[in-house]
Every structure is written in C-alpha cells, then in structure tokens.
Amino acid sequence: PVLCDKNVVNCDFFDAELVLLPGGMPGASTLEKCGELRNLVLRFAQEQKPIAAICASPMVLGKLGLLKGKKATCYPGFEQYLEGAECTGAPVERDGNIITGKGPGAAMEFALAVVELLQGKEKVQELKEAMCVTDL
C-alpha cells in the first residue's frame, strides 16, 4: 500500500499548477468527504487552474457542480454523480481546464492529457516516443 506522510491540511498548494484526484473506491468517497480537499478543488476552479480526476473521482467534481454543461467521463456506474455533465463514456475527456478519465485502462491516455495541458503537444510526443507508445 501507499502510505502518505502528509495530508491535504499539511500541504501548501499556493504554487501548484494542477490538482489531480486519483480514482478507486473507497478512496474517491474519502476525497469527496474531505472539506479541505473540496475547498482546494473549488479554489482551483475559481482561479481557472487545471483539475484532473480519473475513475470514480470525477464524482467529486460532479458533486461540487464543476461538470455542469461539460463533457466528462468516469468509471461505469458513477455517471449519476456527474451532475449536469454530458457523460461520454470516452477513455478521456478534456473540457476547458478539466480533464476526466474513465478508469485504470485509460491511465496512460489520461496522464498524457495532463501533460499536454501543462506542457503542450510537443512534450506529449516526446514522452510517447521515449515510452514506445504508438497507439494513442
């Protein structure tokens, strides 16, 4: 297991470029219940900073109202929590500064979408070549 040595309360996100919510259960529910994390995500949204969530975690964004009118994707069965979103079922969706990923099988495509948002298409191509990724 991965053990955290800090929690969201003990971190300074002032210079953070992006907040990324990992997927899985019960982790996504735990994230959704954390007031400090919800406030951080809302602050990033207000400041128009990038937000990414994969698997079950897009539900956090949905419950905060951040997906209304946006294309989004999530792990099958969690669509009901993406309030007001157009749930596409695609492996990855980027709508503005928000990236959502469907699940574990979309992890590489999701990661490359995050890199593209932060570093651009040239960096994505460089990484794909270095990792021998040819089918994305």
Each predicted region: which residue ranges?
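Beta-strand-turn-beta hairpins that frame and shape the catalytic cleft
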Residues: 93-98
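Extended, subdomain-level signal for the structured scaffold at the beginning of enzyme domains
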Residues: 1-47, 59-63, 68-69, 81-89, ...
